[in-house]
Amino acid sequence: PLYDRTQRAGSPTLIKAILHRVDPPLYGHLQSLQLEWTPILLRWHRLLYMQEFTEATILELWDTLFAIDPTLQLVPYISAAILLSQRDKLVQSEYIDAMQFLMHLPDLNAPRQLVEHAMQLSQTPSASTGAFIARAYEQHPPPEPAESKMESAKHLLRELTAGILTQDGHGQSDWSPRR
């Protein structure tokens, strides 16, 4: 599991664990700033982002969240998605700027999309998911690790060879270099 189930769902430890897994460079930068996560997360989670966004945004966010997850297990993943949606600003920030920014976030354009991204993070907490979410908010994703590039190349090669080596009805390959 991504975190010890005994951890509180909104704890800084869980948010850091998610971020470490989905965007190690952003995680590293925020760690180097030694951010005070407790006041940020208290504000975000205790009031379910009510002080962060406009009333219309909150209503749409809550409607979507409660429809998908009435247990509120997605809340820490929503917070991680918020961080990814603001990645460019955060990686360029120093401590004071980052704290002020996180305490006064810009309004969301697509609250439903944020909840959907949080669900993706909870189901597949990986660097590729983090990069996908960052791109969805027009942020620059972190550089892809060399291993990941190799895995992408292997996957593409498997797809290409599967298309070439399709089987006919008798289990024989229908591919020939003479065709």
Where are these regions (language model features)?
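Helix-rich, well-folded core regions that mediate interactions or catalysis
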Residues: 1-179
